[in-house]
Amino acid sequence: MCGIVGYIGTNNAKSILLEGLEKLEYRGYDSAGIALQNKDLVTVVKEKGRIADLASLVPSDAFGTTGIGHTRWATHGKPNHENAHPHQSKSGRFTMVHNGVIENYTLLKEEYLKNHSFVSDTDTEVIVQLIELFAAELSTKEAFKKALSLLHGSYAICLIDQTDTETLYAAKNKSPLLIGKGENFNVIASDAMAVLKETDEFVEIMDKEIVIVTKDGFTLETLEGEEISRASYTAELDASDIEKGTYPHYMLKEIDEQPAVTRKIIQAYQNEAGEINVDQTILDEILSSDRIHIVACGTSYHAGLVGKNLIEKMAKIPVEVHVSSEFGYNLPLMSKKPLFIFITQSGETADSRQCLVKVKELGYRTLTLTNVPGSTLDREADHSMYLYAGPEIAVASTKAYTAQISVLAVLAVSLGREIGDAEALSINLAAELGIVATAMEAMVSSKEVIEHIAGEYLATSRNAFFLGRNIDYFVAMEAALKLKEISYIQAEGFASGELKHGTIALIEDGTPVLALITQESINWNIRGNVNEVLARGAKTCVFAMENVAQPGDRFVIPQVHPLLTPLASVIPCQLLAYYAALHRDCDVDKPRNLAKSVTVE
């Protein structure tokens, strides 16, 4: 949610900022803006809408060797010109962009800025006005630090001082921000992908630190003034990794990448003997626990439900799955030695991060499954396992979901082998995941079938239901989330046995009902539920695995191991959502009101 790019150097910052903001579009935004500093002149251009709209408003001769840019996802105030960033202080001396939420901004307004008039409804403008207030008696750095010391909440900030053309200021707390190192320039960004074209060498900024940046270097300090030395790291991404190539949308590209990602996970977790292997320290830590708590949001939560099924079957350890945003309100009764697994694509999800902080304070051990090495949850957890999915740009997660389940399967089977579980010992997981990858390839090669189904069932529908039992129920929930995210159809995933307990009242003539069937044990049960809704006028569609497919089923899913069926059955559901969105002329990669990385609570 929201994105920041800052530049200080010898070149014109304009194109660097605009291109950087384009790379951050996937994070979600409703307005954007840049500020360019040329000597003591600061030019601010901002507007509601897309980066392309902003770029058309920037004068062709706009110039500045220092600049800051921002994409805003509204939290305080409507998405409009006034609330778009950058924001300026009353005199125009200070110009600032900010990600995050300041919880006490109204109190600060009342205490320090009673007589100030404000242009916007944002919490951000309060910060920049405070800095100017304190700068009447303090240096810019000290005024910045004093303002920061008063803030309660999350922030990533980049600041320009009109009277100092040689310096850029930045700070962070609970919101991602990093420094990119260059020759005769330096950059600030909320995500390395924004500035990969400029540099691949980065330094993390930690919570409650500020950085004073010039074109020649930077100084990191705590708010108390202690200087910090921190080594840089080289990003493992390449600028080409975040391009669409020949694809019309990132989402379609990422759906097609899932077979390759699955094979990459096999390679990443295979030992020299060709066996799937997890770090022994992680296995020992988990097996010494008496209960596992999986904490996640959205798609990651759905992957966690599958993970619970796998781990309990293989490792014989009870598992609970929690929604991150609800977890902190009512902590579960803790066993003697619980372990917490956090699943997060970005490694920056604010709700999950707050949960991690809470359980660490209680002294419990933690493991993060993330796609981003070096991310906040990766750094702060005791252990990490990586997804190896590569950058996922589309807001609707596809390859990260299947990567999460694949890595959870790797973990579950490895744990099962450690305790001598017969099923874990009998499964050749590398081979079975290879079969999954082949099945995925077959399905992504059958796009025209799914496209036709999407047009027939969903092009004009206002709602849709997905049914499943057992492990298929978890995929039904994910299928519904994908559809509602990008097509704006009110979709829900249900345990089909619950239909008669309320949901069937919503069925009327033409209601689309899609059933997932991959398990022999529940085949006829769910087909009975399909017949029940069919009798009440529903328009039914069955996606079934080869071993349970019947004449009349609309799509046959290639056979995979029974424990790994979600990896296969989700593929046609992802494609269904994609083509439904196209039929409805929706923005597939950037659906309204959504953000890829949810960095505020």
Curated annotation (Swiss-Prot):
SIS domain boundaries: 282-421, 453-591
Keyword terms, alphabetized: Aminotransferase, Cytoplasm, Glutamine amidotransferase, Repeat, Transferase
Listed Pfam families: GATase_6, SIS
Active site per database record: 2, 596
Entry's EC annotation: 2.6.1.16
A biological-process GO annotation: carbohydrate metabolic process
Subcellular localization: Cytoplasm
Reactions that this protein is recorded to catalyse: D-fructose 6-phosphate + L-glutamine = D-glucosamine 6-phosphate + L-glutamate
Main location as per UniProt: cytoplasm
GO cellular component, one term: cytosol
Residue intervals of the Glutamine amidotransferase type-2 domain: 2-216
One GO MF term: glutamine-fructose-6-phosphate transaminase (isomerizing) activity
Enzyme class: transferase
Summary of the function given for this chain in its UniProt record: Catalyzes the first step in hexosamine metabolism, converting fructose-6P into glucosamine-6P using glutamine as a nitrogen source.
HAMAP family in the cross-refs: GlmS
PANTHER family recorded: GLUCOSAMINE--FRUCTOSE-6-PHOSPHATE AMINOTRANSFERASE, ISOMERIZING, GLUTAMINE--FRUCTOSE-6-PHOSPHATE TRANSAMINASE (ISOMERIZING)
Quaternary context: Homodimer.
Name by which UniProt lists this protein: Glutamine--fructose-6-phosphate aminotransferase [isomerizing]
Organism listed in the record: Listeria monocytogenes serotype 4b (strain F2365)
